[in-house]
Curated annotation (Swiss-Prot):
Organism expressing this protein natively: Nostoc sp. (strain PCC 7120 / SAG 25.82 / UTEX 2576)
Protein's UniProt name: Diaminopimelate epimerase 2
A Pfam entry, by short name: DAP_epimerase
Its job: Catalyzes the stereoinversion of LL-2,6-diaminopimelate (L,L-DAP) to meso-diaminopimelate (meso-DAP), a precursor of L-lysine and an essential component of the bacterial peptidoglycan.
A biological process from GO: lysine biosynthetic process via diaminopimelate
Length: 285
């Protein structure tokens, strides 16, 4: 089975064309394929292009734990670059249907850069979702034994919990990310961003991704964090988001529609051996 591997700011995905699929892509097989010791290794799988009646292409996005994601900003940029590499698109904007909605993408600089119109950020509990009264989830508190955390919740097709802190690092994300991901307020679990505002045009985030764990970069996380900083009046509408994997430009329109632009790198392509499925289950290391 053919695969194509790309990364966007260190956030790596395998692209698999459904026409090349030789077996059902079950959650257990996804776990093995994405495992960095027993499989190819990646932050997820992009299955496409699929047929769509609503857009030019459709895409399914899978997390490394086998669950399906509604939307991934870096995944969409990677898939867009794959479509370009396969000669399926040119530099005219094109549409992609995901479980989290339809986005518009455009190839820039002869394939070096991809711009994705991510859609509109909502802070309303009914959209995210967040349990409780219908409200915008802004500056609410979660009480843990380790302290009180103030957060905002948002969705851009998938759920996010943004926590503003004075200091952030990978240890904070690894220690507290799993707690917030599965916190009872979020019935579908949530992605988590620990955010520090550097100035009115720059923020820094550490990311714990639902279904993937600690992540070097995330497009949808960048979008949610930047929108939150703008919503709180801490940043202007054009924001550089700094992550361990690199920086990305987020532009926020008046109605909180998000545009995201950065590069994508092709890493490899090859044939997946079915021998990797000899292991019955993935060992969590």
């Amino acid at each position: 089975m053919k695969f194509y591997k790309y990364h966007a700011l260190g956030n790596d995905y395998l692209v698999i064309n459904p026409q090349d699929l030789k077996f059902p892509l079950t959650p257990e097989k996804i776990k093995i394929i994405c495992h960095r010791n027993f499989g190819i290794g990646s932050d997820g799988i992009l299955l496409g292009p699929l047929a769509s009646t609503k857009a030019q292409f459709a895409l399914r996005i899978f997390n490394p734990d086998g669950s399906e994601a509604e939307k991934s900003g870096n995944g969409l940029r990677i898939f867009s670059r794959y479509l370009w590499d396969m000669g399926l698109v040119d530099e005219k904007p094109f549409s992609i249907e995901t479980a989290g909605g339809i986005v518009e993408s455009a190839i820039k600089d002869a394939g070096k850069t991809v711009q994705v119109e991510m859609g509109k950020v909502s802070f309303w509990s009914r959209d995210i979702p967040v349990i409780g009264d219908d409200r915008e989830v802004i500056q609410e508190k979660i009480f843990l034994d380790e302290g009180i955390f103030t957060f905002c919740a948002a969705t851009i097709g998938n759920p996010h919990c943004v926590i503003l802190l004075d200091d952030i690092n990978s240890e904070v994300a690894r220690n507290f990310g799993p707690i917030f991901e599965g916190y009872p307020l979020f019935p579908n679990r949530t992605n988590v961003q620990f955010m520090k505002v550097l100035d009115r045009s720059t923020i820094q985030i550490e990311i714990w991704e639902r279904g993937a764990g600690y992540t070097l970069a995330s497009g949808s996380s960048s979008s949610a964090a930047a929108a939150t900083a703008h919503k709180l009046g801490l940043c202007d509408s054009k924001i550089i988001v700094k992550m361990p994997g690199g920086d990305i430009l987020i532009q926020i329109k008046d109605d909180f529609h998000i545009s995201m632009t950065d590069s994508v790198t092709k890493l490899a392509q090859g044939e997946l051996s079915t021998e990797i499925f000899a292991i019955e289950t993935v060992i969590n290391i």
